[in-house]
Swiss-Prot record:
Family annotation (InterPro entries): FAM240 (IPR040261)
Protein name: Protein FAM240A
Family per similarity comment: Belongs to the FAM240 family.
Length: 83
């Protein structure tokens, strides 16, 4: 069955071939994107459970406290006199 009388068979076949190939390529890239998304999310979960992140946060808080005390020595004197 010919869809268009002006076209010969090689163009019709190429169109069908392209349709299948395009679907296969789309399916391939969707799988690859899905894999990469899975790997990225699992890495983020792993880093979220990591103790290193917690340690960095603790050290950051300690350094901020030291800097505050260094920049405002009056606050330390008030705290020692009150306590």
């Amino acid at each position: 069955m010919r869809l268009f009388s002006g076209m010969n068979n090689q163009y019709t076949r190429r169109e069908v071939f392209c349709r299948n190939t395009c679907h296969d390529l789309k399916h391939f890239w969707e799988r690859e994107i899905g894999k990469q998304t899975y790997y990225r999310e699992s890495e983020e979960r792993r880093l979220g459970r990591s103790a290193l992140r917690k340690l960095r946060e603790e050290w950051k808080q300690r350094l901020e406290t030291k800097l505050r005390l260094r920049n405002n020595p009056e606050d330390t004197e008030k705290r020692t006199n009150v306590g």
